[in-house]
Amino acid sequence: MGSMNAMDADLLTVVRGCYGAVRIRDLELTRTQRRHVASLVRTGELIAHEHGVVSLPGAERAVVLARIHGGLLSCQAAMRYYDLPFAEGSEQVHLVVSDSGRFAAVGREVIHVDRSQGSASPTCFPVQALPEALARFLRCHLQDDSPLIALDAALHDERVTAEQIRNLLRGPGSARALARLDRASDRARSPLETLARMDLHAAGLSFEDGVEIEGVGEVDLVVEGWVVVELDGYTYHCDEY
């Protein structure tokens, strides 16, 4: 019994090391280990999912879906992983997979096909690299606000460059994404500044952002060449972003 418990504990540790969810075949288990996995499912220590995936109870649903499809998280789910801001609202998990005929959606997840996209190692978090995820977000999202907020933050923090993103914008939605990229700014210091720029652009008003004024310092926006707009107070700007 002690030996069986030790094997069970080892298997649970392995699944935990795969961010809580893994496709069984990716573990290359022995027949005995597979029997122990089945036993762990029966006792509720593991949960069985579609297409041979098991997870720990409470595993992140987005990770479970990524393992089911053998894909990588992208768009808003990737922004959450990279701790980039976006407009809050209903969130669907978007995944990038390399094979369009692999598996149908098992819920409300959105599947993007990119034949050049590889799959993550079971021990790696299943997410696209940040430049690729941002490029996909710019192409995919229906509204301008979320992708621009995330992109502005990534540019401001020097985590990506505009040129990196531009070079990745190919395929459906790229024209819209390029237009969004042209409106991005590495000088925005908060989502509120991004949203204000969007409103000014929609109103047809000219503006500059992140303007240095002698004797004052940097201000958020100068509208129509003379109206100074300061959006965020000290409480917001004293944090890291």
Name these PLM-found stretches:
Residues M1-G173, D209:
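Short gly/ser-rich loop at a beta-strand->alpha-helix junction or flexible surface loop bordering the NTP-binding
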